[in-house]
Regions:
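FAD/FMN-dependent oxidoreductases across multiple families
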Residues: 233-320
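N-terminal Rossmann-like FAD-binding beta1-loop-alpha1 element of flavoenzymes
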Residues: 4-31
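C-terminal helical "tail/cap" subdomain of flavin- and related membrane-associated enzymes
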Residues: 310-390
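Conserved FAD-binding catalytic core of PHBH/FMO-like flavoproteins
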Residues: 144-149, 153-157, 162-255, 259-262
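N-terminal FAD cofactor-binding segment of flavoenzymes
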Residues: 43-79
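Conserved N-terminal helical subregion
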Residues: 2, 68-175, 180-188, 194, ...
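Glycine-rich FAD pyrophosphate-binding loop
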Residues: 23-45
């Protein structure tokens, strides 16, 4: 029977970051992930990292190993309406407003550091049951079919004083889970532009929904938010037709070239009211799933990770005790709910083509451009969160 102090469910970027933050804590840590190691490291999704996230990754000792693309300027505008603004890193005396990296590359750098620390990672091992008890959580670990460990004769029990769930979707229908279906899908792809990205990102609000372009390597990572019906139409047209549609949305500001294969996924808001329970804490997508309009998901998750690690380091003793987890939850309330509702408000205002809202949107963008303190507030929230370090 394994008896770690901390069982981390999920060896993606969030779970690996937590293990790395606690590597010198004296806690016995084990990670388990149902996926093969290669699948985690090959994840092609792109993540927008805020400047505050860079500071955390530097403290974890992995920043210099990451192949990141900096975002030095963010241009925000709307199609067919007035109002625009541009956020510039030099205005805040920062090297960049944010950075873009593939999820697989980030997981690879974090995993290499975790492996160097000697913390065990159980790949292709699914946690099929969690049973909280007075002094521990009993977890059932099962090797996934076809994995090297699948010949083990019995399911392996594990008794952990604390379980951190850092993978998987939230339980639909749970009384503690708030859900909102935005009736939107995101199309994601890579797209080339003449002249390269020059470390610029674009957020363009259109009648069909917002479009984000993030500089990544030598081209842009594209995220287009549309209705499910419109997503069907855009997936059915050929590459040339799709590029023509994008050109129409952006006008002459950018000249688009080739586009990669498009993928889609549904969008919604889902979060736990309480990120901590009986000897269990939920992180990342297991705690909240946000709309990508503000790029806050992973950045919020990493702030949660850092706060949890800090709480465990300050409260020595039982890591799964109620007082410890209450202290963690209290410390994250302002930033966590601020990010959730900030993102939800952006979706409601900027993903709606109702005429009065379109005018409000234009006025808001104009205000951001003309009122530096307001622009600074938005920029600093995106870079650092509500309670992150400056």
């Amino acid at each position: 029977v394994r008896q770690p102090d901390l069982l981390v469910v999920g060896a993606g970027p969030v779970g690996l970051a937590l293990a790395l933050a606690l590597k010198d804590s004296g806690l016995a840590i084990v990670l388990a992930d149902a996926r093969p190691r290669a699948a985690v490291l090959a994840d092609p999704r792109v993540l927008a990292l805020a400047h505050g996230t860079r500071l955390t990754l530097e403290r974890l000792g992995v920043w210099d190993a990451l192949p990141v693309t900096p975002i030095r300027r963010i241009h925000v505008s709307q199609q067919g309406g007035f109002g625009r603004t541009e956020l510039r890193a030099e205005d805040y005396r920062q090297p960049a407003l944010g950075y873009v990296v593939s999820a697989g590359a980030l997981a690879g750098a974090l995993r290499a550091a975790v492996e160097r620390s000697g913390i065990p990672i159980l790949d292709e091992t699914e946690v099929t049951a969690l049973t909280p008890q007075a002094d521990a959580v009993v977890a059932t670990l099962v090797a996934t079919l076809g994995s090297p460990a699948a010949s083990a004769p019995d399911d392996a029990p594990c008794r952990a004083r604390l379980v951190a769930c850092a993978e998987g979707r939230l339980d639909a229908g749970s009384r503690d889970v708030v859900e909102r279906d935005y009736r939107q899908h995101a199309l994601i792809a890579r797209i080339d532009v003449d002249g390269g990205h020059r470390d610029r990102a674009f957020e363009r609000f259109t009648p069909q929904g917002p479009i984000a372009l993030l500089p990544c390597d030598s081209n842009f990572a594209l995220v287009q938010v549309v209705s499910p019906e419109r997503a069907d139409e855009l997936l059915a047209i050929d590459d040339a037709g799709y590029v023509a549609q994008m050109q129409e949305r952006f006008g002459t500001r950018l000249r688009f070239g080739t586009v990669s294969r498009r993928h889609r996924y549904p969008l919604g808001l889902r979060y736990r009211r309480d990120p901590a329970g009986a000897r269990t804490v939920w992180l990342g997508n297991a705690a909240q799933t946000l709309h990508p309009v503000a790029g806050q998901g992973f950045n919020l998750a990493l702030r949660d990770v850092w706060a949890l690690a800090d709480t465990l380091l300050r409260h020595r003793g039982d890591p799964g005790g109620a007082a410890v987890l209450d202290a963690y939850a209290d410390s994250r309330g302002l930033d966590r709910f601020g990010a959730i509702h900030f993102t939800d408000a952006l979706v409601r205002v900027f993903s709606n083509d109702f005429a009065p809202l379109r005018q409000l949107r234009g006025a808001g963008l104009l205000a951001l451009d003309l009122i530096p303190p307001l622009r600074d507030f938005v920029a600093r929230r995106m870079m650092f969160g509500a309670r992150a370090w400056p």
